[in-house]
Amino acid sequence: MLVRGHHSGKIFPGRRTGSIPGRPILPDAGVSLLELILVLSLFGTLTAIALALVLQSYKGVQLRLSTSTLFDSGTMALNQMTKELRMAGYPSAKAFTSSAVTSYPGLVATPFITVTAYDVVFQSATHQDGIVEQIEYVLAPGSQNLYRYSTHKNLNGSLQASTVQTLLLNNVQNRIIGTPLFTWNTNPSDTQSFPLNVQSVYINMVLQSTSNESGSPASVTLTATCPRINF
């Protein structure tokens, strides 16, 4: 008789019968932690670089704004000084009769009374209204403030008692660094003594702002040539 064998339903140890459904396959925990550290480190580095660039850009903008403000205020003062210095000695005695000059010496403006590296005194009818003023631009020793003093001249040639003081500009560094604010040249053919023979005044204004948010002070140098128009 032929007898057929039957397999039992047992699973023998050591034999693979396939994966068990529903159980996830986890990656190596050590590799994942290393990758996370590298990503965080890279992110931190990029963030630091980005912040540094933003800060540098901000400082650059602040420096440009400070420089622009310094330039604008300096240019305004320089334009006024240039206009008035060009009119030094206006009107001269040539504009009047000799008898008028003798009777009213205050009609005539003396071109330059004092001319030094940091102090210029002159007379002019700057408003062209016939009223002569004695004007002084002075940068005092150790000071960064440039002042303008103005005193009206009486018809008899004397000066009025009241003087108007105006702060033209601060942060002027010429005294601090030893650079002359004013230089000049004279007319060699003029027989008058100095400073009456001064023909032109040159302004060299060095400005520097105080520290700002940029961390660096703004610096500007402005120059002008002021020839006397009625020389």
What annotation goes with each model-predicted range?
Residues 62-63, 69, 85-122:
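Short, glycine/small-hydrophobic-rich surface segments
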Residues 109-189:
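Type IV pilin-like appendage domain
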Residues 153, 208-212, 231:
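Short coil/turn motifs at secondary-structure junctions
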